[in-house]
A protein has these predicted regions:
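A substrate-binding/cap region within the structured catalytic cores of diverse enzymes
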Residues: 1-69
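N-terminal start-of-chain detector that recognizes signal peptides
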Residues: 47-48, 75-78
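Short catalytic/ligand-gating loop segments at beta-alpha or beta-beta junctions
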Residues: 55-57, 78-81
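C-terminal regions of proteins
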Residues: 61-64, 69-75, 82-138
Length: 138
């Protein structure tokens, strides 16, 4: 509710569990569009921005945690929301560990699985294409 400011009031121990503060926020239009599309009754533009900033803190924290634990190879599994279009976690990971070789994989659901639809191209480095009637877990 209070943006990033109240995070500074967390105890030193609590701050160990999040990305370093102050967080250099990077706008993610995809995230903002997603939150706007939720059409929450009575929501204001500031509410969407706060939700996007909360999401950025999550992504930055995941990026920071990965950066602190990288060995020769590191696999991190997350929903595409956190890494589509090289944004989200990737943005912050590149800040915390510049020069890393990062590859993203996205699962795509389509009617026809023999060829990727053009609208999904460039969202990830690799794709796993599954039929639309495949069981989901969300």
């Amino acid at each position: 509710r209070g943006g990033f400011g109240p995070l500074e009031q967390l105890s030193a121990e609590a701050k160990n569990y999040i990305a370093p503060l102050p967080l250099n926020y990077v706008r993610n239009e995809g995230v903002e569009t997603y939150f706007r599309s939720m059409e929450m009754p009575g929501a204001k533009k500031e509410d969407t921005e706060k939700l996007a900033k909360a999401q950025a803190l999550k992504d930055a924290t995941m990026g920071w945690s990965i950066a602190q634990n990288i060995g020769s190879y590191f696999v991190h599994l997350n929903g595409s929301f956190h890494s589509a279009n090289q944004a989200g976690i990737i943005t912050y990971l590149n800040r915390y560990r510049p020069g890393l070789k990062i590859a993203t994989v996205e699962v795509v659901r389509q009617e026809k699985t023999d060829k990727l639809d053009k609208d999904v191209m460039r969202k990830a480095d690799f794709y796993i294409c599954v039929p639309t009637d495949m069981t989901t877990t969300y």
